[in-house]
Structure formats: C-alpha cells, structure tokens
From Swiss-Prot:
Keyword ATP-binding applies: no
One GO cellular component, as annotated: mitochondrion
Name this protein carries in UniProt: GTP:AMP phosphotransferase AK3, mitochondrial
Cellular localization per UniProt: Mitochondrion matrix
Chain residue ranges for the region called NMP: 37-66
Binding site for GTP: 17, 19-22, 128, 138-139, 161, 172, 201
Keyword Nuclease on entry: no
Residues with N6-acetyllysine modification: 29, 34, 64, 80, 174, 189, 203
Species name: Bos taurus
Chain positions with Phosphoserine modification: 37
Residues reported in the UniProt entry to bind AMP: 38, 43, 64, 91, 94, 98
Modified positions (N6-succinyllysine) in chain numbering: 20, 29, 57, 64, 80, 174, 189
Enzyme Commission number(s) from the entry: 2.7.4.10
Length: 227
C-alpha cells in the first residue's frame, strides 16, 4: 500500500465557509482514505431511524445542541467499521470533551486546520441570495442576478436565508471560535496540528496536498473514483 505501515488517523477543522468541504472532497479524490463527515453520518442515522439517530433528533427538534457523549458514540461506532482504512474526520471533534474521548480510542496523527480570515468567510457566506419560488441560488460575487436583488426569470425579489445574513454569520463564526479554540490548543500541545492559512481554497489546497503526500498513498488513476 505504500507510505507507512501504520494507518493514518486524521481530522480536518475549519469554520463554516472556510472551504473545508471542498478540501475534504479533494483529499478523498487524490488519496487512499475514508472521509467521515459527522454531519452526513448524523443525517444518515436520523433518516434510518437508528437508536442514536432518534436520540439526536430529539435534541435538534428542541433547537438544542447534540450533547458531546451522543456525538462521540455516533462517530466511534462508525469508526469501528473503518479500522483497516486510513481515515479523515470532518466536523468531529468539535469540542474539547469530544477530542479527549476520541483520544481514548484512537491516536490522532494529524489535524489539518484551515485558517481563513473571518472577514473573507463573512463575504463568502453573505454573498448568497435565493429565489424562494424556484430555489434558484445567486452569488453576488460569482453569479450575480442581472438586477441586484431581483430574480432573472420572474422579476420577483430575492431573499437571504437566515443562515446567510451578516448578523447570523458573525454569530456562527464567534460560536465556532469559542468552541474550537480549546480543541486547536489541545492538538497544538500534542504536536499534531497543521495549520494552513489563506484567503482562497485553490491557493491553500496545493500546500495541503504536498503535506499529505508525505503521509498517505495516492490513488492510482484507474481507482481514483470516490469510494
């Protein structure tokens, strides 16, 4: 299989809008590893009505955060199926208790931290507007409507999702920072934190790629389909 004999245990961290999803999918495309998104895992369990999915849904329905022990159970249960693979966790651990619980089960080798200035993220996230009737999405920077605030086809007004409003974005970013700073510090002290800073995903990616080349076998061209 190449690289080292020991399998890689890694996690990726980054604020909402940091490009974490894009970087994760590129990592999965280029390297031999399993990508485990805690958000996808949660949705899948809720959809299938598993015991832990039902439990998690009760918190979500009440507008509460899912407790650390529930998220930890969810992820550790899934990781049992991935013991023979290199893996990359995405969206977990999000808090210090989650990181400590993960540590008791697995030795984490690398934590990739995408450090994108909050101002850049705020611009990215608040640039999105939608046409409620059709679900058409516009981005003020990349594909703006012909007339500001108006849907191209119907002439109806565009709206901004609650999540994309500047005040909501700022609140989410501050909450992320408060929650994850202790986690980053925890991994920094362990000497496994690798921070990649920048304002554009396409400029950050080559550095992440070069770093992972030293840690992981690459997919051969014939098998480079996403697992």
């Amino acid at each position: 299989m190449g690289a080292s004999a020991r399998l890689l245990r890694a996690a990726i961290m980054g604020a909402p809008g940091s490009g974490k999803g894009t970087v994760s999918s590129r990592i999965t495309k280029h390297f031999e590893l399993k990508h485990l998104s805690s958000g996808d895992l949660l949705r899948d369990n809720m959809l299938r009505g598993t015991e832990i999915g039902v439990l998690a849904k009760t918190f979500i329905d009440q507008g509460k955060l899912i407790p650390d022990d529930v998220m930890t159970r969810l992820v550790l249960h899934e990781l049992k199926n991935l013991t023979q693979y290199n893996w990359l966790l995405d969206g977990f651990p999000r808090t210090l208790p989650q990181a400590e619980a993960l540590d008791r089960a697995y030795q984490i080798d690398t934590v990739i931290n995408l450090n994108v200035p909050f101002e850049v993220i705020k611009q990215r996230l608040t640039a999105r507007w939608i046409h409620p009737g059709s679900g058409r999405v516009y981005n003020i920077e990349f594909n703006p409507p012909k007339t500001m605030g108006i849907d191209d086809l119907t002439g109806e007004p565009l709206v901004q999702r609650e999540d994309d409003r500047p005040e909501t974005v700022v609140k989410r970013l501050k909450a992320y920072e408060a929650q994850t700073e202790p986690v980053l510090e925890y991994y920094r002290k362990k000497g496994v934190l690798e921070t990649f800073s920048g304002t554009e995903t396409n400029k950050i990616w080559p550095h992440v790629y070069a770093f992972l080349q030293t840690k992981l076998p690459q997919r051969s061209q014939e098998t480079s389909v996403t697992p």
